[in-house]
A protein has these predicted regions:
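An N-terminal, well-structured beta->alpha segment
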Residues: 5-114, 200-236, 244
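Gly/Ser/Thr-enriched, mixed-charge loops and adjacent short helices
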Residues: 18-22, 26, 42-51, 162-289, ...
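Conserved phosphate/anionic-ligand binding catalytic regions in large, soluble enzymes, centered on
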Residues: 47-67, 154-157, 240-248, 252, ...
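N-terminal small/polar loop signature for handling phosphorylated ligands or for N-terminal nucleophile
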Residues: 98-161, 259-315
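Short acidic, glycine/serine/threonine-rich loops at helix termini
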Residues: 108-113, 138-142, 160-166, 195, ...
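Glycine-rich phosphate-binding loop plus the immediately following alpha-helix
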Residues: 167-195, 330-354, 358-367, 421
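Phosphate-binding and adjacent anionic-ligand microenvironments
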Residues: 296, 300-302, 323-325, 343-537, ...
Length: 583
């Protein structure tokens, strides 16, 4: 890496290019201030590299500069995407894309910029009239027969961030070969090649009709209308976390037959600054504080929330003492899979060709549920585009009935090809109604699943290593694990080592088998003789490496064992962290 003086000089030269008339006055003033400041750290951070358009699109802090989310970086990304679409469908007329956005600051500006550039390139842009949930954008791409789509969102990241997700014609985020093809085109674009001037004949505003069609599709995820009719007064508290679920989720719940829906008023206000939470992430208990407070006041049965772009959900239920308990992403996926199988079976709707999908880092309890019920379960890589791929390759042959991942994302039907929080919230409320119909809570149901299929405790360790030195360190950690794989984890003997880069599974008896995956991935997994599972993968979007630990306890027999088994599992997890030098 260049030394400090060299780096500052390079950044100053890059910044000077942003003082030309190609950039607006506001941008020029921001860059000027960075150039004139004595402290050059802001300048360096904004210009030391280009914000990378990766396989998931763009994500970064908003502001002026090559390493920031702004309309010029969004513009170059869109011009590259448009160039790729035109090459992918040569000579084809009436090409179209769908453009949507979330509640974040500048999201509307970026979405309008995207629509303008597509239209200027002769591609019709269906632009949503205002913010919409991510799953509705996926649905609209399929419904309108569009060739691609763009969603301006940074999901649950802090307020300083925004992002750009690229979708293909199936409504899923782009996979090979399109992902690398788009990246190649984006990397060729210079600012003077971007066609910013909109062709208004090629822009169509969409909204209400698509909302209705999407909500009609969500309705098809319902399994048992009768149980909802009996428990229509289930006491539900909902929070939109200042985002896109604010209108759609309550409407979907009412259309399913739920009549007692209470919203967290402070969090139904659209606000890209997310003033009521530290971080708008449903994985953080703090973000659910206001919902739980209202739930206590109203004596609610459960509290549910969506993240700002409404692709992920959070669920809070009452435990055996009546206290609020956050159901984690693995437990959520378990409950969905259990309920879908149990009730489709009971109602005669389960078919031999039905299948479920989970990511490789998600709990193996789902595998037990599927196995005991003779339902096919497929494992795929982390990221919902891989679940979408499994749906796509089986279309017309087998029926997808549900799939999810540990990071609070689930899709209970095949009308959408991304995580769908509105549909998932409706289904979890149906599950809560089903439990209540039997005099149980979601907590009781969770304990029942553990008793029947085995207890597991999952824990994720995030090791953050920022900057270039951090990236090198993460690379070295993975290389070391490959060169000298561990033999045991926290006292448990490893019996299988899986490497998704070489696509091999090596067993303790010396046998080797090929892993059946669509491509390679930089992931390692270790399985122990006591069913402990550890997965290691560097994050694709952040400077960190993740360790996903899953520990089993066969001694779990009933709800009374929960605290004991959880404590024992946490002790085991600490021992595993120690053996991996991550304590």
């Amino acid at each position: 890496m260049a030394n400090n003086a060299e780096l500052i000089k390079q950044c100053e030269e890059r910044a000077q290019q942003w003082l030309t008339p190609a950039f607006d006055e506001e941008t020029r003033n921001e860059v000027k201030a960075m150039l004139e400041a004595e402290d050059k750290s802001a300048l360096v951070d904004a210009f030391y590299q280009n914000l990378e358009f990766g396989t998931g699109g763009l994500r970064g802090i908003m502001g002026a500069g090559t390493n920031r989310m702004n309309k010029y970086i969004v513009g170059m990304a869109t011009q590259g995407f448009a160039n790729y679409i035109l090459k992918a469908f040569p000579g084809e007329e009436n090409l179209s894309v769908v453009v949507g956005h979330d509640c974040r600051n500048n999201s509307r500006l970026f979405a309008e910029t995207v629509a303008a550039i597509f239209s200027a390139n002769g591609i019709k842009a269906y632009l949503f009239e205002s913010l919409r949930p991510t799953p509705e954008i996926s649905f609209a791409i399929r419904e309108l027969g569009a060739k691609a789509g763009v969603n301006v969102t940074a999901s649950h990241n802090p307020k300083e961030y925004n992002g750009y997700k690229a979708y293909w014609s199936d409504g899923a985020q782009v996979l090979a070969p399109h992902d690398t093809g788009i990246i190649e085109e984006v990397n060729k674009v210079t600012i003077d090649q971007v066609k910013f001037e909109a062709n208004w004949d090629k822009i169509k505003i969409i909204g209400g009709e698509m909302d209705y069609d999407y909500m009609t599709a969500v309705h098809t995820a319902m399994i048992d209308q009768d149980v909802i009719n009996r428990q229509k007064n289930l006491n539900i508290v909902y929070s939109a976390m200042h985002g896109t679920g604010r209108v759609i989720v309550p409407l979907c719940l009412r259309s399913w037959g739920f009549q007692n829906i209470n919203v967290v008023p402070e969090q139904m206000v659209v606000d890209g600054n997310f003033p009521t939470v530290v971080s708008p992430n449903p994985e953080n208990a703090e973000a659910m504080t206001l919902g739980m407070k209202l739930g206590t006041k109203l004596n609610a049965d459960l509290v549910v929330a969506t993240d700002p772009d409404a692709d992920r959900l959070a669920i809070v239920c009452r435990d055996d003492k009546g206290e609020w308990m956050i159901i984690n992403g693995n437990q959520t996926a378990m409950m969905f899979c259990y309920y879908i199988i149990e009730n489709k079976k009971k109602l005669g709707k389960l078919k031999p060709t039905d299948f479920l999908v989970k990511t490789i880092v998600t709990t193996e309890v789902i595998a037990e549920i599927a196995k005991k019920n003779n339902v096919e379960l497929r494992d795929c890589y982390t990221g919902f585009k891989w679940i979408a791929r499994e749906i796509a390759i089986s279309e017309g042959k087998q029926q997808y009935i549900g799939g999810g991942e540990e990071s609070f994302g689930f899709l209970p039907y095949d009308k959408v090809r991304d995580k769908d929080a509105p549909a998932s919230i409706c289904l979890i409320c149906e599950i809560a109604a089903w439990a209540k119909d039997q005099g149980k809570t979601l907590y009781d149901l969770l304990m029942q699943i553990y008793a029947e299929y085995g207890f597991s405790k999952e824990f994720t360790v995030n090791v953050v290593r920022p900057g270039k030195t951090g990236a090198d360190e993460i690379k070295q950690m993975m290389a070391d694990f490959r060169a000298n794989p561990p033999k045991e984890l926290g006292g448990s003997k490893i019996v299988t080592w899986k490497d998704y880069q070489s696509l091999e599974a090596k067993h303790a008896d010396g046998s080797v088998e090929k892993l059946d995956m669509p491509t390679t991935s930089n992931v390692l997994q270790w399985f122990c003789d006591d069913n402990t599972k550890v997965s290691v993968r560097p994050s694709g979007t952040e400077p960190k490496i993740k360790f996903y630990i899953e520990v089993k306890d066969p001694s779990f027999k009933c709800a009374g064992c929960y605290n004991r088994c959880t404590a024992a599992a946490m002790d085991k997890i600490e021992a595993i962290k120690k053996s991996l030098n991550q304590d």
